[in-house]
């Protein structure tokens, strides 16, 4: 692949490539989200998270706390950025000033947190691929809740919360 973030401006047809820094190639880039300041945050399954300033082109990349696995990423209504680590089975809360990560442990071990999505109240919903569960982290109280999904072998891939706070999963 390109080992880069690419921006396409449909108004001007301009395509701009933002390459990963030397030494960070082959990050296996996955998902991106914008924070309130307009910075683009992204994950790499090879064990990185990163931030791109689209105006200056400056990119910073940090090692994820537990190595391989960063996958889905999303921005909560309060501007906090969260990501899921599929291989390392946790949710990370990113300090958008420093790139530091606070690890949030879902109740089920080795659940395979794959994607995250916030609701309007700032709760973070998590598709737990390996466990066949839906998780929800409430940062207001630091509490988790989980639901077992129906069927013999559920494997929720993505989670999405609509504007009415209804939670949707694809499996």
Where are the regions that the model predicts?
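A generic tandem-repeat structural signature
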Residues: 1-4, 25-36, 42-48
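Conserved beta-strand positions in repeat-built beta-propeller and related beta-rich domains
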Residues: 1-2, 40-46, 81-87, 124-130, ...
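A short loop-to-beta-strand structural motif that recurs across blades of beta-propeller domains
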Residues: 3-7, 47-51, 89-93, 132-136
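Short loop/turn segments that connect beta-strands within beta-propeller blades
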Residues: 9-13, 53-57, 95-99, 138-142
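A short beta-strand motif characteristic of beta-propeller blades
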Residues: 14-21, 58-63, 100-106, 143-149
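A short acidic/small-residue loop/turn micro-motif
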Residues: 22-23, 48, 89, 108-109, ...
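Beta-rich, blade/repeat-based domains predominating
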Residues: 23-37, 66-78, 108-121, 152-164, ...
């Amino acid at each position: 692949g390109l080992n880069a973030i690419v921006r396409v401006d449909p108004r001007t047809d301009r395509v701009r490539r933002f390459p990963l820094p030397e030494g960070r190639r082959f990050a296996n880039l996955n998902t991106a989200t914008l924070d309130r300041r307009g910075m683009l945050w992204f994950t790499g399954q090879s064990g990185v998270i990163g931030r791109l300033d689209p105006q200056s082109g400056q990119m910073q990349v940090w090692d994820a706390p537990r190595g391989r696995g960063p996958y889905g990423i999303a921005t909560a209504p309060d501007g906090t950025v969260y990501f899921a680590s599929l291989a390392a089975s946790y949710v990370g809360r990113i300090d958008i000033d420093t790139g530091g990560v606070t690890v949030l442990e879902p109740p089920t071990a080795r659940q395979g947190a794959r994607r995250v999505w916030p609701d309007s109240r700032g709760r973070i919903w998590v598709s737990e691929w390996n466990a066949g569960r839906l998780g929800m982290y409430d940062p207001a109280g630091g509490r988790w809740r989980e639901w077992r999904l129906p069927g013999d072998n559920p494997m929720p891939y993505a989670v999405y919360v609509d504007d009415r706070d209804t939670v949707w999963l694809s499996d």
